[in-house]
């Protein structure tokens, strides 16, 4: 039998009403558009559009 170990590098994702988390679980690898948004977030957040602030 093979024992699967848990990866504790990222927080565990649990959907609970008393401790809400975002709908999207934490991701290990960002897409190109997500990386671009992360770089844009390093500047002033007032330059972000409303859609970018929601993402």
UniProtKB/Swiss-Prot annotation:
N6-succinyllysine PTM sites in chain numbering: 4, 35
Transmembrane is among the record's keywords: yes
Sites of Phosphoserine modification: 31, 33
InterPro entries: Cyt_c_oxidase_su4_fam, Cyt_c_oxidase_su4_sf
Domain of life: Eukaryota
One Pfam family linked to the record: COX4
Predominant cellular place of this UniProt entry's protein: mitochondrion
Intracellular or extracellular location(s): Mitochondrion inner membrane
Listed SUPFAM superfamilies: Mitochondrial cytochrome c oxidase subunit IV
Keywords: Acetylation, Membrane, Mitochondrion, Mitochondrion inner membrane, Phosphoprotein, Transmembrane, Transmembrane helix
Disordered: annotated segments: 32-55
GO BP: any one term: mitochondrial electron transport, cytochrome c to oxygen
Pathway, per record: Energy metabolism; oxidative phosphorylation
Family assignment from sequence similarity: Belongs to the cytochrome c oxidase IV family.
Function, as annotated: Component of the cytochrome c oxidase, the last enzyme in the mitochondrial electron transport chain which drives oxidative phosphorylation. The respiratory chain contains 3 multisubunit complexes succinate dehydrogenase (complex II, CII), ubiquinol-cytochrome c oxidoreductase (cytochrome b-c1 complex, complex III, CIII) and cytochrome c oxidase (complex IV, CIV), that cooperate to transfer electrons derived from NADH and succinate to molecular oxygen, creating an electrochemical gradient over the inner membrane that drives transmembrane transport and the ATP synthase.
Subunit structure: Component of the cytochrome c oxidase (complex IV, CIV), a multisubunit enzyme composed of 14 subunits. The complex is composed of a catalytic core of 3 subunits MT-CO1, MT-CO2 and MT-CO3, encoded in the mitochondrial DNA, and 11 supernumerary subunits COX4I, COX5A, COX5B, COX6A, COX6B, COX6C, COX7A, COX7B, COX7C, COX8 and NDUFA4, which are encoded in the nuclear genome.
Protein name (Swiss-Prot/TrEMBL): Cytochrome c oxidase subunit 4 isoform 1, mitochondrial
Biological source species: Sapajus apella (Brown-capped capuchin)
Annotated gene: COX4I1
């Amino acid at each position: 039998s093979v024992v699967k170990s848990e990866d504790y590098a990222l927080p565990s994702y649990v959907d609970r009403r008393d401790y809400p988390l975002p709908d999207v679980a934490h991701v290990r690898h960002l897409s190109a558009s997500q990386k671009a948004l992360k770089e844009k977030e390093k500047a002033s957040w007032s330059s972000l559009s409303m859609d970018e602030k929601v993402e």
